[in-house]
Each structure stands twice: as C-alpha cells, then as structure tokens.
Amino acid sequence: CSAFSRSHPALYDQPGGDYTPTKREIAAFEAGIKLGALYHQFVGAPVSSRTAASLEKAMQESISLQPYVREVKVHIDRDMLAANVFGYGELEGRMIEAQVVIDYQGETVTARLQYDQEKDYPLMSLV
C-alpha cells in the first residue's frame, strides 16, 4: 500500500456527473492503469537472458509502488529473446506476461497482460 493510497483512501468517492462507479469498477480501472503503465514504461528496454530476471524484478517493484496494488507478478518469455550483435535485444510486448492484484477498499480484482498469438497482440483481461 503506497503513501498515496494511505493519504487518499477515498480518491474516487466524489460523485462525478450522474454516475458514481462501483468499487469493483474502480478496482478494474486501476488494474488497467497498472498494466498499461507496466507495458509502456518497459517495452523497448534492453534485455538479455542474463538480465531478464532483474528486469522482471524492476518491473514488479515499480508497479508495486502505485496505489491499491496488492501483488504484481511479471514473467519475460526467455524463448522470445533474440540477441543482436552486441548480445542483447529489446523487450517486446509479446514477451511480457504480467498479473496484478488490486484491492480498492476491500474489493479485489486480478488482471492479466498476456500475448494472444491468434490476434498477434498483447491483451489485458480480468481473471
């Protein structure tokens, strides 16, 4: 639980317009924010089979700092890593499998980022 979420526990409690989202909707939204941030912050990062584990850890620790995050797991598919002439490659979205557990005021959701081979695209989903 970050300092931000402790100091702003009711961040979404202010009604906006004619609709106030449910706690579950807020938790799902927060999960999407976390996975989107993870994807866009790290795709393109230099990575090799030697550094993949430390990059996974950095990704997990970075996202775990954000509000409402209970758990983060990240796996980089080592079979997809391709080294250039200098011995490393770039992290691609299709290499990332990530899962976040979000707890917003007692409502918990789990979301996943995973490459969909059929669509040839990394997709997020609630699980």
Labelled PLM ranges:
Residues C1-V127:
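Short beta-strand/helix segments in adaptor/scaffold domains that form protein-protein interfaces
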